[in-house]
Amino acid sequence: MSDLAVKVYPGPQEFIDALLPQLEEHELENCQLIAKSRMWARDKVTGGYYAAVLEGEKLKYALCWAPGNLLWLSYSPPDGSDKDYQLVLAQHLAQVEHAVKGVYGFQGCEPGGETFKNAYEEASKQKFKIARGMATYKLIAVKYPEQSLELLKKGTLRPATKDDALELFAGWYRGYCEQCDMPLPSTEESVKAITNLSSVEMLYIWIVGGEPVSMTFKLRPLKYGTSVAGVYTPPELRKRGYATAMMAAFCARLLETFQFVTLHADKENTTSNHIYQDVGFVKTRDTNDYERSE
């Protein structure tokens, strides 16, 4: 413990340059932190807070935050054996005035997230609560549910393009956000998000009978794995197995390039979670969203 020190990095690029190889040792749990840091570096975001607890050169715990965003916590072991590192980093964060004022919430895998929350509450004199109970899932091999086999023959998976009805998918995106209790984007914001995803071949659609019936996103392609999100079927087309068939086909395609596929899901959404488990996703960690309550 005598060699423990908190190192603060000038910005997201310096943070990711220094820590990426060690963050990749637990890429599954660190995928959000890696991807957010890269995105903020690309966009030249300023004014955030990027810090790590180091023992010599060894990374023990880290976080990254940019104004207007959640703060993201790094991997912590399932047995909670890293409490000292979370305490040190929470106490350091509480001394950074602009971060204390600006951090409205954070996400971390448990039990580390709760340990950090308790330490930060005490040090900053603020209160936080779980906003969304989340779970992290991992898939390394696709299972094909019997009821999906016929649909897999009838359906086609492909990336959406500018020639597709992107306004339709923008409406689906709003429905997805509403379903997940996420901030509801405007029509213009939804069209922009869908257009951006399709321009880099990250929006995929499931076609049956020549018509799109479900959609999903590929997100955060990293060294070992990638993430999926945005799994959505409009209400009038549900209970036909479209999403399950799409996810089986989509994940099989992703595993041609990546070692694993991951996703973060609301623990309360039992229907979606059942779909994920049917095609081979296994829950690995609880990963909760916390928000300031006072």
Name every feature range the model reports, one short phrase each.
Residues 100-110, 254-265:
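Conserved GNAT acetyl-CoA-binding A-motif
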Residues 78, 234, 238, 266:
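Residue-level recognition of the GNAT/N-acetyltransferase active site
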Residues 107-113, 263-277, 289-294:
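Conserved beta-strand-loop-alpha-helix junction that forms the acyl-donor binding cleft
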Residues 82-94, 233, 239-255, 273-278:
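Conserved acetyl-CoA-binding loop-helix of GNAT-fold acetyltransferases
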Residues 57, 64-70, 177-181, 188-229:
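Acetyl-CoA-dependent GNAT
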Residues 1-32, 144-184:
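Short amphipathic alpha-helix that is part of the acyltransferase structural core
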Residues 2, 7-10, 21, 27, ...:
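Conserved donor-binding loop and adjoining core beta-sheet/short helix segment
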Residues 58, 66-153, 290:
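Acyl-donor-binding surface of acyltransferase catalytic domains
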